[in-house]
């Protein structure tokens, strides 16, 4: 690279050398003569200085402002949108060199002030330490002087005793030295240490080799904290500080306590065990459960995994909210006698509803579809002996869960048994539900007016179920009644109220309402409607209620006759409006203080219900994954089911899901309470399902989709019909089997030759009937040697269609000439036979 001097640079830029040197000096460059060399970096520095001095720097902007504008759109309601414009403004300021220099000077001054303050502080500390040292020395001198005076003042006898015991005195002095170490001046300790150093025995090389390695005393924590260690000559040298965050491998497995709730994800479980999530996933794969890290595990699975990995498991309840709610619902008040809740149970068509109709002076049974009860009905009746609340349950086999709920919510069970029919399956089931709930049973032997009635047969049948009549020494009253004529109804009510007196039923009317959901439905005009039986306290219009995973304010209350009421006390059934959804039958209803608490608990229950449901569903899939491997896929009948009430929906789902076998199954892809809507029709279209409406109808939008897409939609009002139709559909999906029927057997007696057909077998029909143009088998020694078709059948040179047993005929077999005497010709037909479930 060519070197440029100041003189050459002045010629290039066309300026005098003196002026260029002056400018270079202003730029801070060290050049003083024209012969000095100018480097590229010095040229750049000179150029920057000249630009700044000629106004380029002043023309640069000192302040830059950046503006940013973003526009977003928010959706409000259905189709309305709102545009939101956000404007942001930022200003960047470029400081001048003077300001930067002033800032630097200020920082230097602050640093100097801090150093000065630190120095003054150190001087004060040193002065304070010197003062303390002088005070300590003065105190030690005073103590030594006092000790000398005390010794000189001792009597002569003490001096003689001290002289007589020269050995004991040094010992006492030593003890005094040990007790008062601070009295000895520091220089005396140094002298003693120096004397010991000179007088102690120094070991030889051999002794050093034989001697064990000396133990290293632990370093002083004070010295280590200062970062120094004591040197060989009493000085201090720098000590490398140890890493405070060092890690040591554990010598044994660490057992941790793992808290597991009702559900837990794989990642949370791994975090509690302090292992990687991948390790838990790998371990569960080895156990035969393929999972992902975010998968929810149920409590049992998580407990098994944690225990297998060697950790302690603590099962915790996540019901803090529920416990707070239960605590807030505690109420102390005066308890009064309440009316009994009586559930009428029994087999289908044994007259339960008819008996209730006579008691209520109503006609419910006449208006029921198919003459059978398909919902739980709740009524309260005022009698001469007091009020009684009745629950009427269905007797059909499909309504098992409904009957179980009726038994749980009741005080007394009236078991209706038809005198002309006897103990039936649902009668036995009702007895089991009542015994499981611990409820007393009153047996009503109905239809006693019929000539074929046999009450003794009823007693024998129920005694076998451990329901012993009172006259036999048991505790179950048997009352013969006739729902048609009203015979024995008063005696039945008297027996019920007598049982209620024995039970001593109590309730607190002043407490907040608490009860159970008997039934729920979705009304098109009023929304979700729940039939609630108040069990304790008083339910009032306007109360905030929590029902299972639903909540809401009671907007209106209706009694069983549809009349509006303002409040309902214990043992009163009411319909409430205002919930945010249709609760499940059997859910507990409680009155809470405010909407916030109700929403909080309801959302907690919804999340918990969803997690448990997902965990169980996935566990079921994992259990069946290997069982289903290698098997053909089942044929599935998809159904979208809508019902009028929640109880009927549950009963139908349970009954339909139980249909099917190893080849066909029913899958309810969607179900709900209320009419068939457009979304139901679209779901049926997407899943290739059949739409079933039980006591409900489709709206106009749904009907339009059904007609346009050709969907199959059916209405029902009797549970028998829907179950029978689904059974027929499943039977059709099974297809048919081909079965062979042997029509006849002919024995070959002789063989003839025909120019047209070849070998003709002269046969005697021994069994059945031989038909022409039917499939045949040729058997030789009872072994099939040919299978074909019977082409020609003649009798006395005449073609015939069939030949009966005991007659001779000639048989020509198509494409077969190896017929021999003694063969048997078996004629059969293939028939399609429909399969059944």
From Swiss-Prot:
Q: Which UniProt keywords apply?
A: Cytoplasm, GTP-binding, Initiation factor, Nucleotide-binding, Protein biosynthesis
Q: Where is this region: G3?
A: 392-395
Segments for region (G5): 482-484
Q: Where in the cell is it found?
A: Cytoplasm
Tell me which InterPro entries the record gives: DNA-bd_dom_put_sf, EF-G-like_DII, IF2_assoc_dom_bac, IF2_II, IF2_N, P-loop_NTPase, Small_GTP-bd, T_Tr_GTP-bd_dom
Segment G2: which positions? 371-375
Q: Which residues bind GTP?
A: 346-353, 392-396, 446-449
Low complexity bias: start-end ranges: 149-171
Give start and end of each tr-type G domain: 337-506
In this chain, the stretch annotated as Disordered covers 94-253
Source organism, top-level taxon: Bacteria
Region of interest: G4:
446-449
Q: Biased-composition ranges for Basic residues?
A: 230-244
- ATP-binding among the record's keywords? no
Any single Pfam family the record assigns to this protein: IF-2
Identify the stretch(es) annotated as G1: 346-353
Its GO CC terms are: cytosol
Q: What does this protein do?
A: One of the essential components for the initiation of protein synthesis. Protects formylmethionyl-tRNA from spontaneous hydrolysis and promotes its binding to the 30S ribosomal subunits. Also involved in the hydrolysis of GTP during the formation of the 70S ribosomal complex.
Family indicated by similarity: Belongs to the TRAFAC class translation factor GTPase superfamily. Classic translation factor GTPase family. IF-2 subfamily.
- Stated name of the protein: Translation initiation factor IF-2
Question: Upper lineage ranks?
Answer: Bacteria, Pseudomonadati, Pseudomonadota, Gammaproteobacteria, Pseudomonadales
């Amino acid at each position: 690279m060519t070197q440029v001097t100041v003189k050459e640079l002045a010629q290039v830029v066309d300026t005098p050398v003196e002026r260029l040197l002056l400018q270079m000096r202003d730029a801070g460059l060290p050049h003083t003569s024209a012969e000095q060399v100018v480097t590229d970096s010095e040229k750049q520095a000179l150029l920057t200085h000249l630009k700044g001095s000629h106004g380029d720097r002043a023309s640069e902007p000192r302040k830059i402002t950046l503006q940013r504008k973003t526009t977003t759109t928010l959706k409000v309601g259905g189709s309305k949108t709102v545009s939101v414009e956000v404007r942001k403004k930022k200003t960047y300021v470029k400081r001048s060199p003077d300001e930067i220099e002033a800032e630097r000077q200020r920082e230097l001054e602050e640093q100097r002030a801090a150093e000065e303050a630190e120095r003054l502080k150190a001087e004060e500390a040193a002065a304070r330490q010197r003062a303390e040292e002088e005070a300590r020395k003065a105190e030690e001198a005073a103590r030594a002087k006092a000790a000398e005076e005390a010794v000189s003042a001792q009597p002569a006898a003490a001096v003689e005793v001290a002289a007589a015991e020269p050995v004991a005195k040094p010992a006492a002095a030593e003890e005094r030295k040990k007790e008062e170490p601070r009295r000895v001046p520091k220089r005396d300790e140094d002298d003693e240490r120096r004397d010991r150093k000179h007088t102690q025995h120094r070991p030889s090389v051999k002794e050093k080799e034989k001697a064990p390695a000396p133990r290293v005393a632990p370093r002083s924590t004070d010295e280590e904290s200062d970062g120094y260690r004591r040197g060989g000559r009493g000085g201090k040298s720098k000590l490398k500080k140890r890493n405070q965050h060092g890690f040591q491998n554990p010598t044994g497995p660490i057992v941790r306590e793992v808290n597991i709730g009702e559900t837990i994800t794989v990642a949370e479980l791994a975090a509690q065990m302090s292992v990687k999530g991948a390790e838990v996933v790998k371990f569960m794969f080895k156990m035969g459960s393929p999972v992902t890290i975010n998968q929810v595990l149920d409590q049992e699975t998580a407990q098994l995994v944690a225990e297998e990995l060697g950790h302690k498991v603590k099962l915790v309840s996540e019901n803090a909210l529920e416990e707070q709610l239960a605590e807030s619902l505690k109420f102390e008040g005066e308890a009064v006698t309440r009316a009994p809740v009586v559930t009428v149970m029994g087999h289908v068509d044994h007259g339960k509803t008819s008996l209730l109709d006579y008691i209520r002076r109503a006609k419910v049974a006449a208006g029921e579809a198919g003459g059978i009860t398909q919902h739980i009905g709740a009524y309260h009746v005022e009698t001469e002996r007091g009020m009684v609340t009745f629950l009427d349950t269905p007797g059909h086999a499909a309504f098992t869960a409904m009957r179980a709920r009726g038994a749980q919510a009741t005080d007394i069970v009236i078991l209706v048994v038809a005198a002309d029919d006897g103990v039936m399956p649902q009668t036995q089931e009702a007895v089991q539900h009542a015994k499981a709930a611990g409820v007393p049973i009153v047996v009503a032997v109905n239809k006693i007016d019929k000539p074929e009635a046999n009450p003794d047969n009823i007693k024998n049948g129920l005694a076998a179920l451990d329901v012993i009549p009172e006259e036999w020494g048991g505790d179950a009253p048997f009352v013969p009644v006739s729902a048609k004529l009203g015979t024995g109804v008063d005696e039945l009510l008297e027996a019920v109220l007598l049982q209620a007196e024995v039970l001593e039923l109590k309730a607190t009317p002043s407490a907040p309402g608490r009860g159970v959901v008997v039934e729920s439905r979705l009304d098109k005009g009023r929304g979700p409607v729940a039939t609630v039986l108040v069990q304790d306290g008083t339910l009032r219009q306007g109360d905030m209620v929590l029902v299972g995973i639903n909540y809401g304010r009671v907007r209106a209350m209706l009694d069983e006759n549809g009349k509006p009421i303002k409040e309902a006390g214990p043992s009163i059934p009411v319909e409430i409006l205002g919930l945010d959804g249709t609760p499940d039958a059997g859910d507990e209803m409680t009155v809470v203080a405010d909407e916030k608490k109700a929403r909080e608990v309801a959302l907690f229950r919804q999340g918990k219900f969803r997690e448990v449901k997902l965990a169980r569903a996935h566990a079921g899939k994992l259990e069946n994954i290997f069982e289903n491997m290698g098997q053909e896929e089942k044929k599935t009948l998809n159904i979208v089911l809508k019902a009028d009430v929640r109880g009927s929906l549950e009963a139908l789902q349970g009954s339909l899901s139980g249909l099917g076998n190893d080849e066909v199954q029913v899958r309810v892809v969607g179900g709900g309470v209320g009419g068939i809507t457009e979304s139901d029709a679209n779901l049926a279209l997407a899943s290739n399902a059949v739409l079933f409406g039980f006591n409900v109808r489709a709206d106009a939008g749904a009907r339009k989709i059904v007609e346009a897409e050709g969907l199959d939609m059916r209405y029902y009002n009797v549970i028998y019909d829907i179950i029978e139709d689904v059974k027929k559909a499943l039977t059709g999906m099974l297809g048919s089997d081909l079965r062979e029927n042997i029509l006849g057997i002919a024995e070959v007696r002789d063989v003839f030759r025909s120019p047209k057909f070849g070998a003709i077998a002269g046969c005697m029909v021994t069994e059945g009937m031989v038909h022409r143009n039917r499939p045949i088998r040729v058997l030789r020694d009872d072994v099939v040697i040919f299978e074909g078709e019977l082409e020609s059948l003649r009798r006395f040179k005449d073609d015939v269609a069939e030949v009966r047993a005991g007659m001779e005929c000639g048989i020509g077999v198509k494409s077969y000439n190896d017929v021999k005497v003694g063969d048997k010709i078996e004629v059969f037909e293939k028939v399609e036979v429909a399969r059944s479930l």
